[in-house]
Curated annotation (Swiss-Prot):
Organism (species): Dactylis glomerata
Protein name: Prolamin alpha-3
Domain of life: Eukaryota
Amino acid sequence: NVQLDPFFQEQQQYYQQQQAFFL
């Protein structure tokens, strides 16, 4: 798992925000 990577954290946060937008 790479959830400790700060860049990945930011990307996942952005992805979740986009997902919420499309939902």
